[in-house]
């Protein structure tokens, strides 16, 4: 009898754990899918769709620039990037986690992009990113914080450049 009770308890416990894990996996997959769709929107240079993935109170922390804390400032960052004729971008999530509450998650991954530098020369870049997402009341995920930086070494000023100022 004790064996039956133990087996039943273990079976129910494992079943409950599987249900919990399946829910988390489903939420993580939904977040991964949202991030992948966002990457496709940016790759197709669709400004409106790209910016639509941000929450109303989002903050973007681009490298070597001030934080963008308004929708207009975020739109300007993307507008400037997408306007470059040589601009190509893609990113892929390598880690996705959703809080137990189910309404907050983060994505980290890698990106590749090409765009023109100040002289018009195409520059290839690759790096990593982190996004913090919020699940809204309508069930859609929106990015509340977005930051990225390059894996490439920072370029050094030309010798004597500081002295010429």
Regions found by a protein language model. Give the residues of each.
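Short, acidic, Ser/Thr-enriched surface-loop or helix-capping motifs
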Residues: 55, 117, 136-138
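A solvent-exposed, acidic/Ser-Thr-rich amphipathic alpha-helical stretch
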Residues: 28-32, 47-102, 108-110, 115, ...
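A short acidic/glycine-rich loop-to-helix N-cap element
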Residues: 118-123, 153-159
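Short, low-complexity N-terminal intrinsically disordered segments enriched in polar/charged residues
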Residues: 4, 8-12, 18-56, 155-165
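Glycine-rich beta-strand-turn "strand-cap" elements at beta-sheet edges
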Residues: 92-101, 147-152, 160-164
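Short beta-strand edge/turn micro-motifs at domain boundaries
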Residues: 126-154
């Amino acid at each position: 009898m004790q064996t039956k009770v133990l087996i039943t308890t273990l079976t129910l416990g494992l079943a409950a754990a599987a249900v919990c894990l399946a829910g988390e996996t489903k939420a993580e997959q939904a977040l991964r899918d949202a991030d992948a769709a966002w990457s496709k929107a940016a790759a197709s240079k669709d400004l409106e769709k790209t910016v639509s993935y941000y929450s109303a109170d989002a903050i973007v922390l681009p490298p070597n620039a001030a934080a963008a804390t308004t929708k207009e400032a975020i739109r300007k960052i993307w507008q400037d990037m997408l306007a470059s004729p040589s601009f190509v971008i893609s990113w892929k999530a390598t880690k996705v986690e959703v809080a137990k509450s189910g309404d907050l998650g983060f994505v980290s991954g890698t990106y590749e992009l090409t765009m023109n530098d100040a002289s018009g020369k195409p520059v290839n870049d690759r790096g990593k990113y982190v996004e913090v997402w919020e699940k809204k009341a309508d069930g859609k995920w929106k990015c509340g914080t977005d930051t990225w930086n390059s894996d490439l070494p920072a370029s050094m000023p030309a010798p004597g450049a500081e002295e010429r100022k």
